[in-house]
Every structure is written in C-alpha cells, then in structure tokens.
Curated annotation (Swiss-Prot):
GO terms, biological process: cell surface receptor protein serine/threonine kinase signaling pathway; innate immune response; regulation of oxidoreductase activity; regulation of protein complex stability
Keyword line: Cytoplasm, Immunity, Innate immunity, Mitochondrion, Nucleus, Transit peptide
Gene this protein is translated from: ecsit
UniProt keyword Transmembrane present: no
Superkingdom assignment: Eukaryota
Region (Disordered): 413-452
Organism classification: Eukaryota, Metazoa, Chordata, Craniata, Vertebrata
Primary location group: cytoplasm
Protein's organism: Danio rerio
Protein's UniProt name: Evolutionarily conserved signaling intermediate in Toll pathway, mitochondrial
Biased composition (Acidic residues): 431-442
Matching InterPro entries: ECIST_C, ECSIT, ECSIT_N
Statement: the UniProt record of this protein carries the keyword Transmembrane: no
Disulfide bonds: none
Family: Belongs to the ECSIT family.
Primary role: Adapter protein of the Toll-like and IL-1 receptor signaling pathway that is involved in the activation of NF-kappa-B. Required for efficient assembly of mitochondrial NADH:ubiquinone oxidoreductase.
Amino acid sequence: MSASHHLLRLQCVRCVSHFLGTPVRQVILPGRAHLQTPGSQHIYVQLLRPFHRSAVCSTDRQNRTDIEKLVEDETHHKDKTLVTHDDIFDRAAGDSKTKVEFNRVVDVFKSKDIRRRGHVEFIYAALKKMPEFGVECDVTVYNKLLDVFPKEVFVPQNFIQRMFNHYPRQQECGVQVLEQMENYGVMPNIETKVLLVQIFGEKSHPIRKFQRIMYWFPKFKHTNPYPVPHVLPSDPVDLAQFSLTRIAADLDAKITIYQYPSTDITETGEEITRPHIVGIQSPDQRSLLAKHNPCKPVFVEGPYPLWLRQKCVHYYLLRADPIPPEEKVEEEIDPEMICPEQSLFFPQRVELDLKVDMGDDHSFNVDEVEEGAVYAMCMAGQGDQATLSQWISGLQETCPILGQIPTVFRLESGPRELQTSTDDHQRPEQEAETDQIIEDDEEPRHSRGVKQ
C-alpha cells in the first residue's frame, strides 16, 4: 500500500476523534487499531504499522568520538552561509595540526551521512585549511577530498545533460580542487583520474582540467636549468653556500667561510653567540677591486631577499658607485683584430649589434640604468654592522687595497630588526626621550658609518 493511503487513514482516525469529542486511546494491533472512547462502542479501523528505527541509524550511540559530536553539532546549528565547516578543523585538531588529524576529520564527515549533505562546503573549507595542516603538497590528501563526492550521481546520462553544464556547482568544486593542486605543483595520479570519472564522467569539466594538467606539467617539469631541491639544507652554512652559488654568475667564483656559528660562555657566565659569515668572490671581481680608486668609498648594502621555494634568505653586497662619464676610459682596439687577414669563419672581432634585428623598430628606446660594480657578496646570521665588519676584514686578506678604501655601511632594517607590537604602545614620554637620544647621537652615528 502506498504512503499516501497510509496518511489518509491516519487523518481519518484524527477526524473520528474530533467527531466524537472525546479522547481516543490507540492500541496498536497486528493489523488494526482499536479506538476506545469512554461510553462508546469499540470501533476498529485498520491503521499503519508503527515504523521502527534501525539501531545502526540511531544518533544516541554511546561510542561517539569527539569529532563526530562536533560534526553533528555543526550540522544541527549551522548558519545559512555557504561555508559552515571551518571551525570543525580548528576544534578537532587543536594544537596538533597534522596529516593524521586532517584525514580523521575527512573520514568522520564521510561516515556521518551516506548522502553527503554539505559536501561542497566541506571541500571548500578543507582546501582553505590544507596549508595550516601542511598537506597542501600531498596528492593522497587531494584524492581523499575527491572521494567525499558521491559516486555516479553527477554523471550525465544523455547528450542533453552533456551539452549543458550538468551539476555546475559540484563540477566547479572539482575544478577548484585541481586548481589548488596545480598551484602547488602537485601531479595527479591514476587514482585521481579514476575518482573523477566515477564522480563526473568522462566528458566533464574536471576531466578536461585533469587532461590539461597532465599535458602541460611534464613539459614544464624540467624547463628550469637551475632547479631548486624540494628539501633544502637545514644547516645555515650549507644553505648560504647553496644560495650564493645560485646567485653568482661566474663558475670560477670561490666561496669562503669566514666564521662558523658558535656559542661561547665568558668567565662572568655571559653567553655570546657568534653568527655564521659566508662570502663569495670571483677572480674578475678581485681584479676590479684592485683597480678601484682609493679616494672613492665602497658601500656595503643590504639585506636583499632571495626566495628558495618557501624559504627566504638575505644577502649583502660590496659595491661601488657608477663611474662618471668623464672618467670612463674607452678600450683601444687592436688593429690586428680588424685587419683584412683575419679569418671569416673565426673572426676575432665582429662589429654587429646582435640585439637589433632588421625588422625591429629603432624609434623605441629603452634607457638602461648603469650601476656600479659588485665586488663581493656574503650571507651572515646577523645583519648588524659589527658582523659585516668581520666580513670586510676577511676580504682584506685577499685584497689588501681594501684597507685603504673607506667603507660606508648602507644597511636597511633586516628581518630580525622589525618593530614588535610592544613598541606600538610606547608612551609619549618615552617617545620624546627616544627622539632626544636620536638627535644627540645622530652626528656620532655618521662618523661611525665610514670605516677608514
């Protein structure tokens, strides 16, 4: 018997109770309902058998975990917004945000409801929380998120559904998962394709996105001739050597370690930390420094950032000002290099502008900014003037003329010298005293900025 007939019979029972105007007691019999009213005859009406709820679907289980309770509370008390699962990851993980906790939250959501209600909002919230758990570069976690989608529900069944955007919100969510994989450089595997085919079908937008990724990723995988390793050295000295070698354009450049990181304890019990100092200099830079005019200063500038994947290091330069045009000396051309007897196949000198082609527009001109020569580079654990002075002292061993050249330190605030939040709440009296100290100490600081 259909459900509509059952509902009509239940409504008839309520009408009988309203017509008699007396309370009715229902006694559930195997196939009939015995309606008893005080002072009336027995009326037998066939009623629907009571529905029994399975023990598996009961929500009063005693062995529920904390995450299951959080997911259930979030489902019952969720807002009408699009994303309502952001707090589940924070409250479930607590302080330990690891891959295990992330997978645990996903598993609890999958086992909560077989229909996966709210799975799109959950996937968007999980994508946003992946960098906090450190799983943004793990392909297995992305496959686990794709497994949250119901299978064979969003697959188009005819050509009309394929022609239009079938279930656009779910397809857009699947494309967003692949977009994040592409942004973090994660290569999909065969399991990703199987999941996408089971969820959206073979002619869907996520499958087309998957095909584009698999076409372009192998082509650009080895295009960089100087790749950065995925695991960087943990030792600061090794990391500095790798970074300076990557910056230097000369293969003959030599790396020198002027000081290793160490910690000493004085007789008074004071702890002194010595940072590492690693420098690099090529033979051409050394010869240019030897020709530098001792009357003109050289400058120590920095720090300049260098990004190695997600890690940022800083380096410093020893450079000079650009040479004025009136002091430039043109190189004399050897007449033997341009004589008619030179070989046409191996010419010693060719006066051709290789930067300009025959069809180029000569009216467009780009002003090239001239910069001074760079004599050396270094990386140090601390960017203060005392530490960099030790680097200059080490350079004087190979370039004695550096002791006769004045050195000016033009240093900016490094990463360890940023203003903290406690300095923002400084009292006006303290600020006035600080300004007075700076004004009094301004002239000695200029004198200390130049090292003779």
